[in-house]
Design a protein with these regions (language model features):
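Short juxta-domain linker segments that transition from a proline/glycine-rich
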Residues: 1-264
Length: 264
Protein backbone atom coordinates (compact mmCIF):
# COMPACT_ATOMS: atom_id res chain seq x y z
CA UNK A 1 0.00 0.00 0.00
CA UNK A 2 1.34 3.42 -0.98
CA UNK A 3 1.89 5.84 1.89
CA UNK A 4 1.69 9.56 1.19
CA UNK A 5 4.16 11.91 2.84
CA UNK A 6 2.75 15.14 4.37
CA UNK A 7 6.20 16.76 4.15
CA UNK A 8 5.78 16.78 0.37
CA UNK A 9 2.82 19.15 0.68
CA UNK A 10 5.02 21.60 2.56
CA UNK A 11 7.79 21.14 -0.01
CA UNK A 12 5.41 21.75 -2.91
CA UNK A 13 3.99 24.87 -1.26
CA UNK A 14 7.51 26.25 -0.72
CA UNK A 15 8.40 25.67 -4.35
CA UNK A 16 5.13 27.01 -5.78
CA UNK A 17 4.85 29.81 -3.18
CA UNK A 18 1.32 28.68 -2.35
CA UNK A 19 -0.54 29.57 0.82
CA UNK A 20 -2.90 27.12 2.51
CA UNK A 21 -5.80 29.34 1.42
CA UNK A 22 -4.74 29.10 -2.22
CA UNK A 23 -4.41 25.33 -1.93
CA UNK A 24 -7.88 25.15 -0.39
CA UNK A 25 -9.31 27.16 -3.26
CA UNK A 26 -7.76 24.84 -5.84
CA UNK A 27 -8.51 21.51 -4.14
CA UNK A 28 -11.64 21.99 -2.07
CA UNK A 29 -9.80 20.64 0.98
CA UNK A 30 -10.32 22.93 3.98
CA UNK A 31 -7.37 24.88 5.34
CA UNK A 32 -7.95 23.24 8.72
CA UNK A 33 -7.64 19.77 7.18
CA UNK A 34 -4.55 20.73 5.15
CA UNK A 35 -2.94 21.98 8.36
CA UNK A 36 -3.82 18.74 10.16
CA UNK A 37 -2.44 16.63 7.29
CA UNK A 38 0.82 18.59 7.28
CA UNK A 39 1.15 18.16 11.04
CA UNK A 40 0.28 14.43 10.82
CA UNK A 41 -2.81 14.81 12.97
CA UNK A 42 -4.96 13.14 10.31
CA UNK A 43 -3.83 10.69 7.60
CA UNK A 44 -2.75 11.92 4.17
CA UNK A 45 -5.07 9.83 2.00
CA UNK A 46 -4.80 8.94 -1.67
CA UNK A 47 -7.96 10.97 -2.35
CA UNK A 48 -6.41 14.11 -0.86
CA UNK A 49 -3.10 13.46 -2.63
CA UNK A 50 -4.91 13.15 -5.97
CA UNK A 51 -6.75 16.45 -5.42
CA UNK A 52 -3.52 18.27 -4.59
CA UNK A 53 -1.60 16.65 -7.46
CA UNK A 54 -4.32 17.68 -9.93
CA UNK A 55 -4.40 21.23 -8.55
CA UNK A 56 -0.66 21.84 -9.00
CA UNK A 57 -0.16 19.51 -12.00
CA UNK A 58 2.34 17.29 -10.17
CA UNK A 59 2.62 13.50 -10.58
CA UNK A 60 0.90 11.63 -7.77
CA UNK A 61 4.17 9.83 -7.04
CA UNK A 62 5.70 13.14 -5.90
CA UNK A 63 3.63 12.96 -2.71
CA UNK A 64 4.81 9.47 -1.79
CA UNK A 65 8.54 10.22 -1.88
CA UNK A 66 10.41 10.28 1.42
CA UNK A 67 13.34 12.66 0.97
CA UNK A 68 14.64 14.19 4.19
CA UNK A 69 13.59 17.87 4.41
CA UNK A 70 16.45 20.34 4.02
CA UNK A 71 16.32 23.46 6.23
CA UNK A 72 17.11 26.57 4.15
CA UNK A 73 19.80 27.47 6.70
CA UNK A 74 21.89 24.46 5.60
CA UNK A 75 22.28 25.76 2.06
CA UNK A 76 25.03 28.12 0.98
CA UNK A 77 23.21 30.59 -1.24
CA UNK A 78 23.48 34.25 -0.43
CA UNK A 79 20.58 36.62 0.06
CA UNK A 80 20.12 40.24 0.99
CA UNK A 81 18.30 41.42 4.10
CA UNK A 82 15.36 42.38 1.85
CA UNK A 83 15.01 39.04 0.09
CA UNK A 84 11.51 37.69 0.66
CA UNK A 85 11.15 34.52 2.73
CA UNK A 86 9.01 32.87 0.05
CA UNK A 87 11.83 33.31 -2.47
CA UNK A 88 14.33 31.71 -0.09
CA UNK A 89 11.89 28.86 0.50
CA UNK A 90 11.37 28.33 -3.24
CA UNK A 91 15.11 28.08 -3.93
CA UNK A 92 15.68 25.66 -1.05
CA UNK A 93 12.67 23.55 -2.07
CA UNK A 94 13.89 23.21 -5.66
CA UNK A 95 17.36 22.29 -4.46
CA UNK A 96 15.89 19.67 -2.10
CA UNK A 97 13.96 18.10 -4.99
CA UNK A 98 17.04 18.07 -7.22
CA UNK A 99 19.27 16.55 -4.55
CA UNK A 100 16.64 13.92 -3.73
CA UNK A 101 16.23 12.96 -7.38
CA UNK A 102 19.99 12.61 -7.87
CA UNK A 103 20.23 10.52 -4.68
CA UNK A 104 17.51 8.11 -5.84
CA UNK A 105 19.14 7.65 -9.24
CA UNK A 106 22.53 7.07 -7.61
CA UNK A 107 21.04 4.46 -5.27
CA UNK A 108 19.24 2.63 -8.08
CA UNK A 109 22.43 2.54 -10.15
CA UNK A 110 24.43 1.58 -7.06
CA UNK A 111 26.80 4.45 -7.67
CA UNK A 112 29.58 4.91 -5.16
CA UNK A 113 31.09 8.21 -4.15
CA UNK A 114 34.45 9.12 -5.65
CA UNK A 115 34.83 12.19 -3.48
CA UNK A 116 36.86 10.93 -0.53
CA UNK A 117 39.44 13.52 -1.57
CA UNK A 118 37.09 16.29 -0.46
CA UNK A 119 37.10 14.84 3.04
CA UNK A 120 40.89 14.53 2.88
CA UNK A 121 41.55 18.18 2.01
CA UNK A 122 38.59 19.83 3.76
CA UNK A 123 39.93 22.12 6.50
CA UNK A 124 38.83 21.77 10.12
CA UNK A 125 40.22 25.11 11.33
CA UNK A 126 37.93 27.06 13.58
CA UNK A 127 39.05 30.44 12.25
CA UNK A 128 38.96 32.06 8.78
CA UNK A 129 41.57 30.66 6.39
CA UNK A 130 44.52 32.63 5.09
CA UNK A 131 44.76 33.40 1.39
CA UNK A 132 47.85 31.18 1.25
CA UNK A 133 45.88 28.23 2.67
CA UNK A 134 43.00 28.78 0.26
CA UNK A 135 45.43 28.96 -2.68
CA UNK A 136 46.93 25.64 -1.59
CA UNK A 137 43.52 23.94 -1.33
CA UNK A 138 42.52 25.33 -4.74
CA UNK A 139 45.68 23.86 -6.27
CA UNK A 140 45.03 20.49 -4.64
CA UNK A 141 41.49 20.57 -5.99
CA UNK A 142 42.72 21.15 -9.55
CA UNK A 143 44.94 18.09 -9.23
CA UNK A 144 42.11 15.91 -7.91
CA UNK A 145 40.04 17.05 -10.90
CA UNK A 146 42.89 15.97 -13.20
CA UNK A 147 43.56 19.54 -14.29
CA UNK A 148 46.94 21.14 -14.86
CA UNK A 149 48.35 23.34 -12.10
CA UNK A 150 48.13 26.40 -14.33
CA UNK A 151 46.15 27.51 -17.35
CA UNK A 152 42.42 27.95 -17.99
CA UNK A 153 39.81 25.35 -17.08
CA UNK A 154 38.14 24.71 -20.42
CA UNK A 155 34.90 23.25 -19.08
CA UNK A 156 34.11 23.60 -15.38
CA UNK A 157 30.89 21.59 -15.55
CA UNK A 158 32.57 18.65 -17.26
CA UNK A 159 35.47 18.70 -14.79
CA UNK A 160 33.04 18.53 -11.86
CA UNK A 161 30.78 15.89 -13.35
CA UNK A 162 33.72 13.63 -14.24
CA UNK A 163 34.48 13.22 -10.52
CA UNK A 164 30.85 12.68 -9.52
CA UNK A 165 29.42 16.12 -8.75
CA UNK A 166 26.08 16.90 -10.43
CA UNK A 167 25.76 20.43 -11.84
CA UNK A 168 22.18 21.47 -12.56
CA UNK A 169 20.30 24.63 -13.62
CA UNK A 170 17.55 25.94 -11.35
CA UNK A 171 14.53 28.16 -11.98
CA UNK A 172 13.54 29.54 -8.55
CA UNK A 173 15.60 32.69 -8.91
CA UNK A 174 13.12 35.15 -7.46
CA UNK A 175 12.49 37.17 -10.63
CA UNK A 176 8.94 37.94 -9.50
CA UNK A 177 10.09 39.52 -6.25
CA UNK A 178 10.75 43.23 -5.81
CA UNK A 179 13.94 42.18 -4.01
CA UNK A 180 15.62 39.49 -6.08
CA UNK A 181 17.75 36.85 -4.43
CA UNK A 182 21.39 37.84 -4.62
CA UNK A 183 22.67 34.33 -5.12
CA UNK A 184 23.45 32.62 -8.38
CA UNK A 185 24.47 29.23 -6.96
CA UNK A 186 23.34 26.78 -4.28
CA UNK A 187 24.96 23.80 -2.56
CA UNK A 188 24.79 21.87 0.70
CA UNK A 189 28.32 21.14 2.02
CA UNK A 190 27.12 18.94 4.90
CA UNK A 191 24.74 16.70 2.93
CA UNK A 192 25.80 13.04 3.09
CA UNK A 193 25.18 11.73 -0.43
CA UNK A 194 27.21 9.78 -3.00
CA UNK A 195 26.57 12.41 -5.68
CA UNK A 196 26.44 15.98 -4.33
CA UNK A 197 24.64 18.66 -6.31
CA UNK A 198 25.62 22.18 -7.31
CA UNK A 199 22.65 24.21 -8.50
CA UNK A 200 22.99 27.45 -10.44
CA UNK A 201 20.15 29.88 -10.88
CA UNK A 202 18.85 30.64 -14.36
CA UNK A 203 19.82 34.18 -15.15
CA UNK A 204 21.26 35.66 -18.32
CA UNK A 205 24.84 35.59 -17.10
CA UNK A 206 28.04 35.38 -19.10
CA UNK A 207 29.98 32.14 -19.33
CA UNK A 208 32.70 33.49 -17.06
CA UNK A 209 30.16 34.43 -14.40
CA UNK A 210 28.59 30.97 -14.49
CA UNK A 211 32.01 29.32 -14.26
CA UNK A 212 32.82 31.44 -11.21
CA UNK A 213 29.45 30.57 -9.63
CA UNK A 214 29.99 26.82 -10.02
CA UNK A 215 33.52 26.95 -8.60
CA UNK A 216 32.32 29.22 -5.79
CA UNK A 217 29.88 26.47 -4.73
CA UNK A 218 32.64 23.85 -5.06
CA UNK A 219 34.59 26.03 -2.65
CA UNK A 220 31.74 25.86 -0.15
CA UNK A 221 31.58 22.07 -0.49
CA UNK A 222 35.27 21.76 0.38
CA UNK A 223 35.98 24.67 2.72
CA UNK A 224 32.78 24.46 4.78
CA UNK A 225 32.10 20.75 5.02
CA UNK A 226 33.28 20.90 8.63
CA UNK A 227 33.17 24.66 9.25
CA UNK A 228 29.53 25.70 9.05
CA UNK A 229 29.92 27.59 12.34
CA UNK A 230 31.59 30.48 10.46
CA UNK A 231 29.54 33.57 9.73
CA UNK A 232 27.86 33.78 6.35
CA UNK A 233 30.13 36.68 5.41
CA UNK A 234 33.25 34.66 6.26
CA UNK A 235 32.03 31.68 4.25
CA UNK A 236 31.21 33.83 1.24
CA UNK A 237 34.59 35.55 1.35
CA UNK A 238 36.44 32.23 1.48
CA UNK A 239 34.40 30.73 -1.36
CA UNK A 240 35.08 33.84 -3.48
CA UNK A 241 38.80 33.58 -2.82
CA UNK A 242 38.76 29.86 -3.63
CA UNK A 243 36.99 30.43 -6.96
CA UNK A 244 39.50 33.10 -7.94
CA UNK A 245 42.47 30.94 -6.97
CA UNK A 246 41.05 27.90 -8.79
CA UNK A 247 40.24 29.72 -12.03
CA UNK A 248 43.37 31.88 -12.06
CA UNK A 249 46.17 30.24 -10.07
CA UNK A 250 48.74 32.50 -8.46
CA UNK A 251 51.46 31.58 -10.99
CA UNK A 252 49.18 32.57 -13.88
CA UNK A 253 48.30 35.86 -12.23
CA UNK A 254 51.95 36.69 -11.54
CA UNK A 255 52.89 35.92 -15.15
CA UNK A 256 50.14 38.17 -16.50
CA UNK A 257 50.98 41.07 -14.21
CA UNK A 258 54.71 40.71 -14.88
CA UNK A 259 54.05 40.85 -18.62
CA UNK A 260 51.89 43.95 -18.25
CA UNK A 261 54.54 45.64 -16.12
CA UNK A 262 57.22 44.98 -18.73
CA UNK A 263 55.02 46.43 -21.49
CA UNK A 264 54.36 49.61 -19.54
Amino acid sequence: MVEYNPDRIVLMRRLEKKTQAELTEGTGISTAKISKIQNRIVPFTKEDAEKIATCVDYPLSFFSMDDTPTPPTELTYRRSSKTLVREINAVSAEYEIMAGTVRRIAERLRMKSHLQWIDDIAPRDGTPLSMEKINHIAQETRRYLNLTDTGPVRNVTRALERVGIAVMPMHSSGEESEYKTTSEGVSNPTLDTPVPVIGYLGRNNTGDRLRFTKVHELGHMILHKYRIHLTRQQMESEAHQFAGAFLMPEDDARAIFAKNDSIS
